[in-house]
């Protein structure tokens, strides 16, 4: 079967416009990496925000990374922490590590070694105590 990226993109857009968070998450990647479309971080952020607001943990983590680096949005460490926390609370290990790093570095939150360790332990599957 031959892949038809244009057809797939059409259907992802249709599903994304109808509010499908998984399709919106995929569209975020498509636009971030320019897979069959012009690469556009602003458009990636738009799709990830749509999915993140519906509770999609992967999109929340991706949106956090965009805020952390200032790609497609104004750099905002506080917003990065907010979105990583949402993903981390759903068990996303990468988000837990990144949230721990933010506490370690005091970026977007007050520096707090104990809070950083709590998130690192969660990411490692250990007790958060």
Question: What are the residue ranges of the model-derived segments?
Answer:
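Hydrophobic face of amphipathic alpha-helices that form TPR/SEL1-like repeat modules
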Residues: 1, 26-33, 62-69, 73, ...
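Short helix-capping/linker turns of helical repeat alpha-solenoids
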Residues: 4, 12, 17-20, 33-35, ...
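Alpha-helical tetratricopeptide repeat
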Residues: 46, 82, 123-127
């Amino acid at each position: 079967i031959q892949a038809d990226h244009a057809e797939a993109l059409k259907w992802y857009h249709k599903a994304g416009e109808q509010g499908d968070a998984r399709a919106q998450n995929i569209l975020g990647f498509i636009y971030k990496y320019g897979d069959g479309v012009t690469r556009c971080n602003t458009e990636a952020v738009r799709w990830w925000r749509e999915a993140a607001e519906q509770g999609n943990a992967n999109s929340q983590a991706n949106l956090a990374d965009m805020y952390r680096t200032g790609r497609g949005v104004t750099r905002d460490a506080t917003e990065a922490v907010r979105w990583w926390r949402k993903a981390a609370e759903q068990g996303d290990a990468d988000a837990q590590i990144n949230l721990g790093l933010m506490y370690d570095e005091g970026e977007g939150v007050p520096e707090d070694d104990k809070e950083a360790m709590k998130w690192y332990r969660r990411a490692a599957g250990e007790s958060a105590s």
